[in-house]
């Protein structure tokens, strides 16, 4: 291999480095320097903020987010199976059925242990008569 094969890549890498240096340099030159008390407050379109801006999300939020990702991946796998349904035959059908069954059992388990329950633990559902 000769140098002439690599010069476009070297030129591209050099241009990227120059562009990054320019962006960082302009940011440093034009950026805000003095740290005031208002710098740490969230921007609310000129409206004075009320309350504490750094709220903690309950762990339930993250659990539901993880469950969403898991079951969203299930949908992607089922879609891929549906596209290749004719090529996979009965073996593919059995595999997809086992996959859906396992994830269905996992969903029922998560529901039973309360992973999808957003109510505080002290409250019970009131039945309307």
Curated annotation (Swiss-Prot):
It is found in: Cell inner membrane. It catalyses: a quinone + NADH + 5 H(+)(in) = a quinol + NAD(+) + 4 H(+)(out). It is an enzyme of class 7 (translocase). The chain crosses the membrane at residues 6-26, 63-83, 89-109. Disulfide bonds: none annotated. One of its GO terms (molecular function) is quinone binding. Pfam families: Oxidored_q4. Keywords: Cell inner membrane, Cell membrane, Membrane, NAD, Quinone, Translocase, Transmembrane, Transmembrane helix, Transport, Ubiquinone. The keyword Zinc-finger does not apply. Its EC number is 7.1.1.-. GO terms for cellular component: NADH dehydrogenase complex; plasma membrane. InterPro entries: NAD(P)H_OxRDtase_bac/plastid, NADH_UbQ/plastoQ_OxRdtase_su3, NDAH_ubi_oxred_su3_sf. Coiled coil: none annotated. It is a multi-pass membrane protein. Belongs to the complex I subunit 3 family. NDH-1 is composed of 14 different subunits. Subunits NuoA, H, J, K, L, M, N constitute the membrane sector of the complex. NDH-1 shuttles electrons from NADH, via FMN and iron-sulfur (Fe-S) centers, to quinones in the respiratory chain. The immediate electron acceptor for the enzyme in this species is believed to be ubiquinone. Couples the redox reaction to proton translocation (for every two electrons transferred, four hydrogen ions are translocated across the cytoplasmic membrane), and thus conserves the redox energy in a proton gradient. PANTHER family: NADH-QUINONE OXIDOREDUCTASE SUBUNIT A, NADH-UBIQUINONE OXIDOREDUCTASE CHAIN 3. This is NADH-quinone oxidoreductase subunit A.
């Amino acid at each position: 291999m000769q140098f002439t094969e690599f010069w476009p890549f070297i030129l591209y890498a050099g241009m990227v480095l120059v562009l990054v240096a320019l962006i960082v340099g302009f940011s440093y030159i034009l950026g805000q320097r003095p740290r005031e008390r208002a710098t740490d407050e969230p921007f609310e379109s000129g409206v004075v903020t009320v309350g504490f801006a750094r709220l903690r999300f309950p762990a339930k939020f993250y659990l539901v987010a993880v469950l969403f990702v898991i079951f969203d991946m299930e949908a992607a796998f089922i879609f891929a199976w549906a596209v290749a349904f004719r090529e996979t035959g009965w073996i593919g059908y059995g595999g997809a059925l086992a996959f859906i069954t396992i994830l269905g059992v996992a969903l029922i388990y998560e529901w039973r242990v309360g992973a999808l329950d957003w109510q505080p633990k002290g409250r019970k559902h009131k039945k309307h008569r």
